[in-house]
A protein has these predicted regions:
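Outer-membrane beta-barrel transmembrane domain signature of Gram-negative proteins
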Residues: 1-18, 69, 81, 100, ...
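Short loop/turn motifs that connect adjacent beta-strands in outer-membrane beta-barrel proteins
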Residues: 16, 51-63, 122-125, 176-182, ...
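Transmembrane beta-strands of outer-membrane beta-barrel pores
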Residues: 23-29, 50-52, 69-75, 132-138, ...
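Extracytoplasmic gating/loop element in the C-terminal half of outer-membrane beta-barrel translocons
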Residues: 28, 303-397
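C-terminal beta-signal and terminal closure region of outer-membrane beta-barrel proteins
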Residues: 95, 159-164, 208-242, 331-334, ...
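Conserved small-residue
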Residues: 157, 174-277, 404-407
Length: 443
């Protein structure tokens, strides 16, 4: 249960300067038995309308700069300050808690600031909105090992510093010519995250010893020792992925093929970073064309960069039921070094019955699509004695994948329980193309 008090204040001066202040205090039941009974987080925003303060060139009809600083707090998982019995799903028994109770837990906090610019020019035909932001998330919880003589196996440490920074740009256009109207809006967004600190330098709350943690294995994106693995390192990103296996090679870097045409997989104890799941940037372009009650809308979207993993493709290749394996058989095999390797031997080496070895089943997540197409028609108001506006419309979404190299839609997620399963395919349903119609009545 969370009980909160929120307050805000807004001040303005001569329609030129605007100041906004907010503050919120939460009393969270998860803080029970903790030294801290509640947590407070404020924000402040300031904007200046330059077009009201200065004489600007005629081409600029409106200009505003803005900046803000915000703190957002959230509580940790429940029962960390007062652990109870834990249910073992394998034995179906309730067991003693394994996590050492903590009484000095603090809320996780994200401190962020941003600056922005809004411009309108050429008699409001064009508008530009630009924002740069940076945020740092602190006091994240992680578990560390403690001596079993304490009666527990794990203790909670609050540490970490994850930084996100990015840029958001939007450029719009709106005009009419002899009854024909066109409005357009293009967007560009990018975000870069970086693990500034994990738990290095923190102190084990039970032993009092310094913790050395500059790397954290988050988990496998599928079958262990087959799928790629997300590993957090100080200085890396939150979605860096690593692989452990590759086709066995000789000293010259050539893939080894024995006299019977067989290949092998070599596993390494040292993982190799191959990229991350995040997009380099995202693009969007929305257009509306209007003429005499007709409105045609077109939305294009693009995601550029990042990697995607398909366990499905690895399994289908392994059993020889994929289009890729069929094409390889028709072509007489797979070209390796200066010869051909039997398709079955190749795919049953890099693929498995539980997914394909990550190095060979990672794809670019770049994709461009026709996100939405709509057509609306507003009936003449005189048909309804000028008392109502009636609009009829049809709409289609996800209509056309213009460009995509991955064998699945990279925008789908294999799981809703973790952000790390974005761009991962494990026999998911294909993305859907939707069609609909609507009737809108306004009085």
């Amino acid at each position: 249960e969370i009980q909160s008090v929120f307050a805000s204040a807004e001040l303005s001066w001569r329609n030129q300067l605007y100041l906004t202040l907010t503050g919120r205090n939460d009393w969270d039941s998860k803080l029970a038995f903790s030294d801290q009974a509640s947590f407070f987080y404020p924000s402040v925003g300031l904007s200046a309308v330059l077009s009201e303060m200065f004489e600007l060139p005629e081409i600029i009809t409106y200009a505003k700069v803005r900046g803000s600083y915000t703190v957002v707090a959230s509580s940790f998982d429940r029962y960390l300050t007062n652990p109870g019995y834990e249910y073992n799903a394998q034995t179906h028994n309730w067991e003693n808690p394994t996590v050492y109770p903590m009484d000095n837990m603090k809320p996780e906090k994200t401190k962020s600031w941003e600056i922005g610019l809004n411009l309108k020019f050429w008699e409001n035909r064009f508008n530009l909105d630009a924002t740069y932001y940076r945020s740092n998330t602190l006091n994240q919880t992680c578990k560390v090992d403690i001596p079993s003589s304490s009666g527990y196996n794990k203790a909670i440490v609050q540490a970490g510093n994850v930084q996100n920074q990015g840029l958001e740009l939007a450029l719009g256009f709106n005009d009419k010519w002899a009854g024909f109207g066109w409005s357009s809006n293009a967007t560009f967004t990018l975000n870069r995250n970086k693990v500034k600190r994990l738990a290095s330098g923190s102190v084990n709350p039970v032993t009092g010893e310094a913790i050395q943690m500059d790397e954290m294995n988050v988990g496998w994106l599928g079958k262990e020792n087959v799928a790629p693995r997300v590993i957090l390192t100080e200085g890396g990103s939150m979605t860096d992925i690593y692989v452990y296996n590759q086709l066995t090679k000789d000293n010259n870097g050539n893939i080894k093929v024995d006299q019977n045409g067989n290949l092998g997989i070599t596993s390494s104890n040292t993982p190799v970073k191959v990229g991350n799941l995040d997009a380099d940037f995202n693009l969007g372009w929305t257009n509306h064309f209007t003429y005499k009650g007709i409105d045609l809308g077109v939305v294009l979207s693009a995601r550029v960069g990042g990697l995607a993993y398909s366990a499905t493709q690895g399994i289908l290749d392994y059993y020889g039921v994929s289009e890729t394996s069929a094409t390889a058989r028709d072509n007489g095999g797979i070209p390796i070094n200066n010869g051909m390797v039997d398709a079955q031997k190749y795919y049953q080496t890099i693929g498995t019955g539980e997914g394909g070895y990550a190095r060979y089943y990672l794809y670019s997540a770049t994709n461009v699509r026709l996100q939405e197409l709509s057509l609306n028609y507003t009936l003449p108001k005189r048909w309804f004695k000028n008392v109502a506006n009636v609009t009829l419309g049809i709409v289609g979404r996800n209509l056309w994948m213009i460009y995509c190299k991955a064998p699945f839609d990279p925008e789908l997620s294999a799981s809703t329980s973790s952000n790390y399963y974005m761009n991962v395919d494990y026999f998911m349903q294909p993305s859907l193309r939707n069609f609909g119609f609507n009737v809108k009545v306004q009085f």
